[in-house]
């Protein structure tokens, strides 16, 4: 009788463990398209992403690179001070988007150019996304907007 209880307990634990592993795998599989990792331009140059991989690119819009094409097509470069990545975007840019301003875009690399599906700009003069701030600090080009220049 005692041996039967022990066997039953082991069976229940194995089934529960298997169910936990299966549910975790299914949740991870279901969320794989919703997870977009952040990358700075220096990281992309050092370690190019896989073909078709959707990720977020962030940095500063490089001065002198913003070109408006036909229709709603825009090209520019994003930099973190260490490297620059060319970007194309077709659509309406946020009002606060501009050269020298922080941005984060979601998209993928196509033949060396980041093709953005969505562009987000910082929402006021002092805010910068945490990932962009960290990438700029790593490159040594971050300037605190709260501190006066000079």
UniProtKB/Swiss-Prot annotation:
| Topology relative to the membrane | Single-pass type II membrane protein
The record's annotation in InterPro entries points to:
CcmE (IPR004329), CcmE-like_sf (IPR036127), NA-bd_OB-fold (IPR012340)
Instruction: Name one cellular component (GO) term.
Output: plasma membrane
Q: Which Gene3D superfamilies match?
A: Nucleic acid-binding proteins (2.40.50.140)
Record: residues binding heme = 123, 127
Main localization of the protein described in the UniProt heading: membrane
Please cite one Gene Ontology biological process associated with this protein: cytochrome complex assembly
Q: Which residues lie on this side of the membrane: Cytoplasmic?
A: 1-9
Cellular compartments annotated: Cell inner membrane
Q: Transmembrane residues, as ranges?
A: 10-30
The record's keywords, sorted A to Z, are: Cell inner membrane, Cell membrane, Cytochrome c-type biogenesis, Heme, Iron, Membrane, Metal-binding, Signal-anchor, Transmembrane, Transmembrane helix
Effect of changing residue 123 to A: reported as: Loss of function
Q: Which domain of life is it from?
A: Bacteria
Which stretches face the Periplasmic side? 31-150
Database matches in PANTHER family: CYTOCHROME C-TYPE BIOGENESIS PROTEIN CCME HOMOLOG, MITOCHONDRIAL
Concerning its family, UniProt says: Belongs to the CcmE/CycJ family.
Q: What does this protein do?
A: Heme chaperone required for the biogenesis of c-type cytochromes. Transiently binds heme delivered by CcmC and transfers the heme to apo-cytochromes in a process facilitated by CcmF and CcmH.
Protein's name according to its UniProt entry: Cytochrome c-type biogenesis protein CcmE
Q: What organism does the record attribute this protein to?
A: Rhodobacter capsulatus (strain ATCC BAA-309 / NBRC 16581 / SB1003)
């Amino acid at each position: 009788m005692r041996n039967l209880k022990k066997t039953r307990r082991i069976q229940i634990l194995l089934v529960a463990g298997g169910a936990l592993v299966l549910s975790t795998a299914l949740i991870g599989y279901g969320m794989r398209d919703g997870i977009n990792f952040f990358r700075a331009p220096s990281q992309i140059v050092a370690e190019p992403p896989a073909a078709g991989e959707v990720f977020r690119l962030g940095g500063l819009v490089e001065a002198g690179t913003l070109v408006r094409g036909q229709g709603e097509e825009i090209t520019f470069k994003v930099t973190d001070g260490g490297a620059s990545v060319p970007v194309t975007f077709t659509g309406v840019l946020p009002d606060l988007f501009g050269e020298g301003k922080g941005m984060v875009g979601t998209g993928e690399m196509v033949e060396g150019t980041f093709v953005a599906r969505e562009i987000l700009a910082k929402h006021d003069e002092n805010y910068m996304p945490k990932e962009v701030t960290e990438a700029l600090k790593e490159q040594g080009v971050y300037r605190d907007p709260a501190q006066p220049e000079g």
